[in-house]
């Protein structure tokens, strides 16, 4: 990459006439040279920001600069690069470059947006104080940007579907779909009675439930048959029969009967009770 066109040079050199002449001879494609003198008590950043050149963004095709403290290189590049045109060339001179220092410089140039960096050991008439100087030559990357088309949200709304009810929907023919609850089966239905009649075989004139009885005949046959006298003569084995169903066992003959006093032969209902029901 060769310097060409309008080039700015930052240097601490006071008398730059001979240096500029030598620079043009070395770089014949350079048409014009602008020298930005850096004072002894100043630095590159202060010189660029305080000079009239700072108002001329993208003014130069090339910039020649130097760095005395690579720790401040990022700040210096932030001040210098706005003056460089897109695709322009930056030539940076640094003295006493070691391997670790070189890597830091290359990283700073890359972060600054410079590409195609090359380095070589080279002295410059603008920096006679630099011993073993290395020049880093880079190109300012051109970042092209384009507008991203935005998808415009459609303002057209779809019509909301509505249910429509016609008068014919309430005709007499719809009554056929309504279930009559009186036709539903219950435990006393004749169908259930017929199922009991078909269950098992009659033995000695008494129906005996089949092995897998589901009609309730088995439970009915297994229920103990006791007379009222037998019920009154029963003695509680658990002692809780008189307390009510909540305390009675599953086979208690008093299930379903109200609570009574211990020792009572019969269970009487007090119909004259004034308690609220």
From Swiss-Prot:
A motif (Cx2C motif 2) lies at residues 249-252. It comes from the Eukaryota. It is found in: Cytoplasm; Mitochondrion intermembrane space. Residues 199-215 are annotated as: Fe-S binding site A. A motif (Cx2C motif 1) lies at residues 238-241. One of its GO terms (biological process) is iron-sulfur cluster assembly. Residues 135-191 are annotated as: Linker. [2Fe-2S] cluster binds at residues 199, 210, 213, 215. Residues 1-134 are annotated as: N-terminal SAM-like domain. GO terms for molecular function: 2 iron, 2 sulfur cluster binding; 4 iron, 4 sulfur cluster binding; electron transfer activity; metal ion binding. One of its GO terms (cellular component) is mitochondrial intermembrane space. Keywords: 2Fe-2S, 4Fe-4S, Cytoplasm, Iron, Iron-sulfur, Metal-binding, Mitochondrion. Residues 238-252 are annotated as: Fe-S binding site B. [4Fe-4S] cluster binds at residues 238, 241, 249, 252. Its cofactor is [2Fe-2S] cluster; [4Fe-4S] cluster. Monomer. Belongs to the anamorsin family. Component of the cytosolic iron-sulfur (Fe-S) protein assembly (CIA) machinery. Required for the maturation of extramitochondrial Fe-S proteins. Part of an electron transfer chain functioning in an early step of cytosolic Fe-S biogenesis, facilitating the de novo assembly of a [4Fe-4S] cluster on the cytosolic Fe-S scaffold complex. Electrons are transferred from NADPH via a FAD- and FMN-containing diflavin oxidoreductase. PANTHER family: ANAMORSIN (PTHR13273:SF14). The C-terminal domain binds 2 Fe-S clusters but is otherwise mostly in an intrinsically disordered conformation. The N-terminal domain has structural similarity with S-adenosyl-L-methionine-dependent methyltransferases, but does not bind S-adenosyl-L-methionine. It is required for correct assembly of the 2 Fe-S clusters. This is Anamorsin homolog. It comes from Phytophthora infestans (strain T30-4).
């Amino acid at each position: 990459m060769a310097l060409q066109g309008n080039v700015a040079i930052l240097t601490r050199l006071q008398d730059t006439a001979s240096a500029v002449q030598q620079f043009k001879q070395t770089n014949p494609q350079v048409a014009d040279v602008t020298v930005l003198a850096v004072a002894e008590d100043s630095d590159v950043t202060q010189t660029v920001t305080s000079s009239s050149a700072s108002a001329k963004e993208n003014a130069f095709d090339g910039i020649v600069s130097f760095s005395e403290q690579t720790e401040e290189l990022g700040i210096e590049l932030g001040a210098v690069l706005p003056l460089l045109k897109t695709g322009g060339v930056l030539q940076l001179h640094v003295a006493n470059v070691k391997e670790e220092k070189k890597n830091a410089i290359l990283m700073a140039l890359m972060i600054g947006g410079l590409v195609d960096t090359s380095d070589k050991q080279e002295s410059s008439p603008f920096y006679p104080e630099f011993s073993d100087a290395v020049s880093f030559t880079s190109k300012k990357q051109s970042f092209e940007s384009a507008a991203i088309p935005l998808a415009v949200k459609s303002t057209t709304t779809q019509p909301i579907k509505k249910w429509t009810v016609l008068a014919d929907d309430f005709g007499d023919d719809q009554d056929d779909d309504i279930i009559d609850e009186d036709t539903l089966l219950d435990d006393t239905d004749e169908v259930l009675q017929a199922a009991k009649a078909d269950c098992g075989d009659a033995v000695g004139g008494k129906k005996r439930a089949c092995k897998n009885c589901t009609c309730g005949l088995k439970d009915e046959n297994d229920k103990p048959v006791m007379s009222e006298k037998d019920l009154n003569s029963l003695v509680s084995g658990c002692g809780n029969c008189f307390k009510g169903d909540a305390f009675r066992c599953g086979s208690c003959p008093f299930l379903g009967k109200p609570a009574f006093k211990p020792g009572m032969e019969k269970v009487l209902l007090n119909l004259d009770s004034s308690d609220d029901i």
